[in-house]
Amino acid sequence: PPLAPLLPTEKGASLLIDCGANVDARPSHLVQFAKMGSIYMENVMGIRNPRVAIVNIGAEEEKGNALVKETFPLLKECKDINFIGSIEARDIPSGYADVIVCEAFAGNIILKLYEGVGATLISMVKKGMLSTLRSKIGALLVKPALKETLKRFDTSQYGGAPMLGLKGLVVKTHGSSKSTEVCN
């Protein structure tokens, strides 16, 4: 069963599947992840015909490691999903795909980078907004919109990641999660 957190994007959120449960996944596993992710985004998030992409080092079909090269044609042939091809890490925040498929090693790196960039961005913006009198005045004007935008990158807003493919509900959280995160 894969862990499938939602990542904030410019268009809303994308489901990253898998981010920590299956480091040594096989092509058949990634196809199953794509199907589960597509079903989740359609039935839970209300996205009709979700766009599914596989994490790769380039957009071209022939690029990637053995796992990606073996999985790509299987996803392409799969009639149950709306497979749009490869996605590079830099395109994830744009919301290019609704479901982002990968094995857990790559997925965990993507997730941790997202968390780190989010925390750093929040910290940098706060420091910048409080650095001069002029920026403090400007901060008062943009505070509501900025606060709402930055909140999407605050990991405490996301309680955890659902583990899909099980008969019951399982949500994995960080061991350091506080009550706010568990409630979300």
Give the ranges of each region predicted by the language model.
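Glycine-rich phosphate/nucleotide-binding loop
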Residues: P1-L16, Y96-I100, A104-C183
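Glycine-rich phosphate/diphosphate-binding loop of Rossmann-like nucleotide-binding domains
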Residues: V23-A89, D98
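A generic local secondary-structure boundary/capping motif
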Residues: P2-P8, A21, I39-G46, E88-D91, ...
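Glycine-rich beta-alpha junction loops
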Residues: A21-V23, N56-E61, I87-D91, E103-G107, ...
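Short, flexible active-site loop motifs that bind/organize anionic cofactors or intermediates
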Residues: G20, N82, K172
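Low-complexity, intrinsically disordered basic tails/loops
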Residues: S14-R26
